Amino acid sequence: MENSGLLALPLNAATIVPEGAILLALLSSLLVDLAGEKTASRWVPPICYAGLGSALILLASQWNSTLSPSFLGAFLADNLAIAFRAIIATSTLFSLMISWRYVERSGAPMGEYAAILLAATLGAMFLCGSTDLVSIFVSLETLSVSSYLLAGYMKQDARSSEAALKYLLVGSATAAVFLYGASLLYGLTGGSTNLDAVALALQSSDTPVAALALVFVLATVAFKIAAVPFHQWTPDVYEGAPTPIVAFLSVGSKTAGFALALRLLVGCFESFDIQWKFLFSLLAILSMVLGNIVALSQTSMKRMLAYSSIGQAGFVMIGLVCGTEDGFAAMILYLATYLFMNMGAFACVILFSIRTGSDLIADYAGLYQKDPLVTIGLSLCLLSLGGIPPMLGFFGKIYLFFAGWADHQYLLVVTGLITSVVSIYYYISVIRMMVVIEPKEASDVVKSYAAVNWNIPGLNPLRVALLVCVIVTGIGGIFSNPLFQWANSAVAGTPILQKVIVTALGTTGTIS
């Protein structure tokens, strides 16, 4: 009877047409790559742009559409899934634009590289709308395995291979932990993997088994978003992996992790609301404090941005813990703003690395004299990450802090404010080094800085990505209110979030 009920559900394949466009670009990239590197370098970029651009247009056309489960109840294209999938697709688009020159210099096959990155994108996008434990695991592993391959893609670099091995070992352990937690949830439901059935079973189950399943699920989510103490892989992987891949992991993979948190923790563990929010609050505080304090002592730009991303995850977790409409909306808004400011920062780091081969913060000394564009772009993105007004990041943080304060999350908000000040210190230290130091005090690397030449193949897409990210980061604060309304619309069009919000309002009304 259960099988006949499942078969009665529609496939509704139209909901994953955006992913279909990306899959078509993936297969086309592999086919073009067979024709030789010269042909691939000419055709792979436009193929990827067409696939990702089509996916974004198709996602926009699905906004506020009628909700119906897809693939026997394993996927749901609600507004939450659409918003997160759009952020991930955009992060991949920027990652590819800042990748081409980097890949050409390394001599790696361009079509193969693009195909693996698009595969990771597919895994992340499917994860955002998965409503079944099996589809969640398959999506999670698609994202993870592709990420392992990308982290170790520069085989001639020992640090890249080391990063891939560490990422693989920790990621494999996390996959085992999730599988064990999923098996416990499967047992509690009496044999169903659908998240609605899991949520229903957990409402009437306060057993230690359910609590253990919560711990395993929370550990999986914490690993994907690089929250303390599940962050150990992050600095080493960020430092050793190719920089464009680090940019994708810091935005695309993290966004998928927060989508997973909303689907599982908010959607399924409503009866354990107090417990998981307490644990997540603890992780948020640890992430904000450790991420920003350890970043102070870093000498590598990529390691500094790695610890910065740990702290940024802590800020986003404030919105998740709130469990209110404003909290969820602020969380989505901040992830969208983080996309532009972080991608802009990594674009500048890649440009500097291409021209100097260095990743040391000290080597940025006096850069303004030789490369004003990289200096101004990196400065604006770092100021935005620090939450300096009127940058886009300031409005993202202020919405998060307002939502936290309104929900009486005073400790989280105060911790966020203090650690934001700490982050401003190390961001401004980099800016001061680039701008204030006299030409005679510039680093040896900057003194021998190569002349800026944008006619080199692969640099023009990087420049476009850099300019777009910097412009949006610099003046995007003007449009923060429409962005917040978009985020509110995403929350309003997501049934699992509305259910939690209504329940919270009812509880508040009862208490008052």
From Swiss-Prot:
Entry membrane topology: Multi-pass membrane protein
Catalytic activity, reaction form: a plastoquinone + NADH + (n+1) H(+)(in) = a plastoquinol + NAD(+) + n H(+)(out); a plastoquinone + NADPH + (n+1) H(+)(in) = a plastoquinol + NADP(+) + n H(+)(out)
Subcellular location, record wording: Plastid, Organellar chromatophore thylakoid membrane
Residue stretches spanning the membrane: 6-26, 43-63, 80-100, 107-127, 133-153, 168-188, 210-230, 242-262, 276-296, 304-324, 332-352, 376-396, 411-431, 464-484
A single GO BP: ATP synthesis coupled electron transport
Keywords on record: Membrane, NAD, NADP, Organellar chromatophore, Plastid, Plastoquinone, Quinone, Thylakoid, Translocase, Transmembrane, Transmembrane helix
Top-rank lineage group of the source organism: Eukaryota
MF terms (GO), sorted A to Z: NADH dehydrogenase (ubiquinone) activity; NADH:ubiquinone reductase (non-electrogenic) activity; quinone binding
Chief localisation class: plastid
Any one annotated GO CC term: plastid
Pfam families found in the cross-reference section: Proton_antipo_M
Disulfide bridges in this chain: none
Family: Belongs to the complex I subunit 2 family.
Record's function text: NDH-1 shuttles electrons from an unknown electron donor, via FMN and iron-sulfur (Fe-S) centers, to quinones in the respiratory and/or the photosynthetic chain. The immediate electron acceptor for the enzyme in this species is believed to be plastoquinone. Couples the redox reaction to proton translocation, and thus conserves the redox energy in a proton gradient. Cyanobacterial NDH-1 also plays a role in inorganic carbon-concentration.
Protein name: NAD(P)H-quinone oxidoreductase subunit 2, organellar chromatophore
Gene behind the chain: ndhB
